[in-house]
Each structure stands twice: as structure tokens, then as C-alpha cells.
Curated annotation (Swiss-Prot):
HAMAP family: GatB. The gene is gatB. Allows the formation of correctly charged Asn-tRNA(Asn) or Gln-tRNA(Gln) through the transamidation of misacylated Asp-tRNA(Asn) or Glu-tRNA(Gln) in organisms which lack either or both of asparaginyl-tRNA or glutaminyl-tRNA synthetases. The reaction takes place in the presence of glutamine and ATP through an activated phospho-Asp-tRNA(Asn) or phospho-Glu-tRNA(Gln). Keywords: ATP-binding, Ligase, Nucleotide-binding, Protein biosynthesis. GO terms for biological process: glutaminyl-tRNAGln biosynthesis via transamidation; translation. One of its GO terms (molecular function) is glutaminyl-tRNA synthase (glutamine-hydrolyzing) activity. This is Aspartyl/glutamyl-tRNA(Asn/Gln) amidotransferase subunit B. Its EC number is 6.3.5.-. Belongs to the GatB/GatE family. GatB subfamily. It comes from the Bacteria. SUPFAM superfamilies: GatB/YqeY motif, Glutamine synthetase/guanido kinase.
Length: 475
């Protein structure tokens, strides 16, 4: 019997408001433990919450960008459970009347467009953070308690780990573009829980659902789903039954492990939050927010293709991140070869960001500095290969490219007489390659060029090197 997977995702995104959802404490990441707190977010007796209007506005922005219906009337609810990181022993969330519902995003997998439904988006407060350090017990940092979140719940419309990966990538891009969240998984401002079950192909009945946690990257989501789908199919094929539970992804072992039995919604004993009035979003306010939405990724991609002549692949990669798209456009306005800019962003820039785990706004290279580097190549001051060395130094130190070139003596050798002497020496030292070239073996020319580059430590002007080599070899 063949099986298929059914996948749904719950994404928690911290909102980029300056203050918390029900008090004026800062939402800034970091800080000494328990310094961004007050009686309200600590849930002390006698305190009352006041809903931050910006939280509602940002949630509506996200909802509109994700094609949702925005409720004119919604309310907050208490979700009751006990855990040390929850100071009030309940979380203020939304239950039966979410702010946004019935949305969708379109993803592209294997050249086909698929619509993934968004069941609901609701607002809620974050909990604190447990710290398991070398002490007799665990510590709690409540700095994060009360930070505003939106929870985006998809429909179970995904059937492969790749679709889940593409959905998350698209969702992150939209949240960044709308400036609703910075989506930094390493700081916990974007968190993903995955629900997955399997069923016989063709069946409409859902299988037993497993929730996966401890997913700290989109690739981890993909790998965990790949493993979990295989595990569930194996259990069923061996005549077993799937137990509804929450499982943790173990990155080191590449497996999922049981955590606890999955709670049902009624275990939380939801009831309306008595200390907050209902949320009213008028049509006028909704329209005002809609008009303030920025250019979305798909529109920017179309514009980059038509305005800057980028190939579709380049435009898709560049516009997947708002920060990278903005960086590209600043460069393209100052430099007349947008394709060269995109090559650098997708090549060296991307490689070093991946190696260091940094985002483009966290590195010291500005658009103006990259343009200067590209102009140094165009003007023959340095070669393309030397430019990569210069760029690494720029990336690490923030120094201007011309300063690095001067300090390290990296200027190209463009003096014809000087270069001719080096080439004559290379020809004299490699008679076999010279003979091969004269016998029609073009690869020999590449070898000789490589020897010239080696002798000059990559500083020979490539065009001049080829020209002089051909002249000398024709003698």
C-alpha cells in the first residue's frame, strides 16, 4: 500500500513593536535576565493589561499580505495551563474569534504553483524562557514574557517536506517585506511547529497527527519531516498504530524522539479574557493599513526583471529577502551592470553570510563599497579573482576596497614590458605546454595563463596576459 503525507504548520512570529503587547516594557532582544519586566508582564496581583494598538495593526498588515479576511470583531481569550515560564498560569491569546482567517500563499515546487491555505492568524503574548544551566535547578528569564506574537496556522495542504520548506520561505519573505517581524530564528523571533500524519494514497480520512518541535531552521523542518514520514509509514506497514504525541527533532542523531502526549484544545480551558474589551477593526482602518503595504516580493521580482534586465532565477533569489533586494537596488542605482551585482550577491556575498551566519544588514559592507569594488575590476585596477580576496577582507574588517588594495599591494600588473618579461620566463620554463599549444591543444594556453597568474600571485591583467602570450607563442 502506498502512503502520502499530510502536513500543516504553525508559525509563531514575534512582532516588531517597540513595546510589549499589554505593557510599556521594551521588546528588545537580549539584556540581562529579568530586566525588561514590570508588574503587568510578570502577572502580579492587581495589574491590568492594556492592548497595544500597534500589535493589532501589524497583525492586520500580515493578514492582508497573506490574503486573509480581517474580522471586524474579535476578542482575546485566556489559555490556561501551568508552566514555570508562564507567570500568570495562563496565556492571553485568541480562540474562537481570530483576527484573520481564510488566507493563502502560493508556492512554486517543480515548476508548478500550489496554493497553501492559511486557516487563521491570531495574536497572543509570548511566554518567558527557561534556562537550564549548571545549577541545582532551572532558571526563568521573563524578558520575553508579554512580547507580542502572531500565530499563523496553515491548512493541512502540504504533502511533501519540500512544499513545507517553500511555504516557510515564502511566509518569511512576506513577513519581512511587510516589516511585521524580523524573522530571526536564531533569536527566537520565528518559531515553527509541524503537524504531520500519513494516510493511504487516495484516502480522504486524516491519519493520527504528530506534532514536531525543536525545529531551529527551515532545513531542520524539512529533515524532521522526511524522517517522521518514513517512521510513520514503517510503523503502519509493520501492523502498528501511530500514537498521537509531540516529538522532538534530534539534529545530532537525525531522528525524532517522543516528548509528551499531545494535548487537545479543551485541555486549555479557554474562556474570554475579562480584563480586555473586544477588538474592533473598522473597514476604514483596514483600508488605511492596506494602502500602507509595501511592494510585495512577486511584484518586486517582476520589476527587477523588466527594469534591471535580471534573469528570472536571479530576480527570484534576490527578492526572496527584502534586505538583499534593497541592497541590490541601492547598488543598481549607482552601477550600470545589475547582473554583475546579482552575481556577487548570489556568489561571494551569499557564501560568506552562510559561513558566518550573518544577515546582510549585519555585515560591514555597504552597497557603495560593493560598487567601488566592481568599478576597481572594470577599471583594470584588480582582477576578478583578486577582487574575491579583497571582498573577504572588506567583509571581515569593513575597510574600503581601495584601502585594502593599496595596503596589500594587490593592484594588477598592467605594465606591458613588466608582464612580457614574466611571460617569457613562463614560456621558457614550460616547453612541453608550448609544444602542445603549437600542436593545436587549446588547453595548454589555459595552463600557461595559470602559470603566469601563479608567478604574479593573481595580479596579472588577464586580457593583457592572453594578448602577450599569443604574441610570444606565435614567434
Amino acid at each position: 500500500m502506498k502512503y502520502e503525507a499530510v502536513i500543516g504548520l504553525e508559525v509563531h512570529a514575534e512582532l516588531l513593536t517597540e513595546s510589549k503587547i499589554f505593557c510599556s516594557c521594551t521588546t528588545k532582544f537580549g539584556g540581562e535576565p529579568n530586566t525588561h519586566v514590570c508588574p503587568v508582564c510578570l502577572g502580579l496581583p492587581g495589574t491590568l493589561p492594556v492592548l497595544n494598538k500597534k500589535v493589532v495593526e501589524y497583525a492586520v498588515r500580515a493578514g492582508l499580505a497573506l490574503n486573509c479576511t480581517i474580522a471586524n470583531f474579535s476578542k482575546m481569550d485566556r489559555k490556561n495551563y501551568f508552566y514555570p515560564d508562564l507567570p500568570k498560569a495562563y496565556q492571553i491569546s485568541q480562540y474562537d474569534l481570530p483576527l484573520c482567517s481564510n488566507g493563502y500563499v502560493e508556492i512554486e515546487v517543480d515548476g508548478k504553483v500550489k496554493k497553501i491555505g492559511i486557516k487563521r492568524i491570531h495574536i497572543e503574548e509570548d511566554a518567558g524562557k527557561l534556562l537550564h544551566e549548571n545549577t541545582d535547578g532551572s532558571l526563568v528569564d521573563y524578558n520575553r514574557a508579554g512580547v507580542p506574537l502572531i500565530e499563523i496556522v496553515s491548512e493541512p495542504d502540504m504533502s511533501t517536506p519540500e512544499e513545507a520548506y517553500q511555504y516557510l520561505t515564502k511566509l518569511k519573505s512576506i513577513l519581512e517585506y511587510t516589516e511585521v517581524s524580523d524573522c530571526k530564528m536564531q533569536e527566537g523571533s520565528l518559531r515553527v511547529d509541524t503537524n504531520v500524519s500519513v494516510r493511504p494514497v487516495g484516502s480522504t480520512e486524516l491519519g493520527t497527527k504528530i506534532e514536531l518541535k525543536n525545529l531551529n531552521s527551515f532545513r531542520a523542518v524539512q529533515k524532521a519531516l522526511e524522517y517522521e514520514i518514513k517512521r510513520q509509514i514503517k510503523v503502519l506497514e509493520e501492523g502498528g498504530t501511530i500514537v498521537q504525541e509531540t516529538r522532538r527533532w534530534n539534529e545530532a542523531k537525525g531522528i525524532t524522539e517522543p516528548m509528551r502526549t499531545k494535548e487537545e484544545a479543551h485541555d486549555y480551558r479557554y474562556f474570554p479574557e475579562p480584563d480586555l474589551v473586544p477588538i474592533i477593526v473598522t473597514d476604514e482602518w483596514k483600508e488605511e493599513i492596506r494602502k500602507s503595504l509595501p511592494e510585495m516580493p512577486h511584484r518586486k521580482r517582476e520589476r527587477f526583471i523588466s527594469e534591471y534586465g535580471l534573469p528570472e532565477y536571479d530576480a527570484k533569489i534576490i527578492t526572496s529577502s527584502k534586505k538583499i533586494a534593497d541592497f541590490f537596488e541601492k547598488c543598481a542605482l549607482e552601477y550600470d551592470s545589475p547582473k554583475a551585482v546579482s552575481n556577487w550577491l548570489m556568489g561571494e556575498f551569499s557564501r560568506l553570510m552562510n559561513e558566518t551566519g550573518k544577515e546582510i544588514d549585519e555585515v560591514p559592507v555597504t552597497p557603495q563599497m560593493l560598487v567601488k569594488l566592481l568599478k576597481l575590476i572594470d577599471n583594470g585596477v584588480i582582477s576578478g579573482s583578486i577582487a574575491k580576496t579583497v571582498f573577504e577582507e572588506m567583509f571581515g574588517t569593513g575597510k574600503e576596497p581601495e584601502v585594502i588594495v593599496e595596503e596589500k599591494g594587490l593592484k594588477q600588473i598592467a605594465n606591458e614590458d613588466e608582464l612580457r618579461e614574466i611571460i617569457k620566463k613562463v614560456i621558457a620554463e614550460n616547453p612541453k605546454s608550448v609544444e602542445d599549444y603549437k600542436n593545436g591543444k587549446e588547453k595548454a594556453m589555459g595552463f600557461l595563463v595559470g602559470q603566469v597568474m601563479k608567478a604574479t600571485k593573481g595580479k596579472a591583467n588577464p586580457q593583457l596576459t592572453n594578448q602577450i602570450l599569443k604574441e610570444e607563442l606565435s614567434k
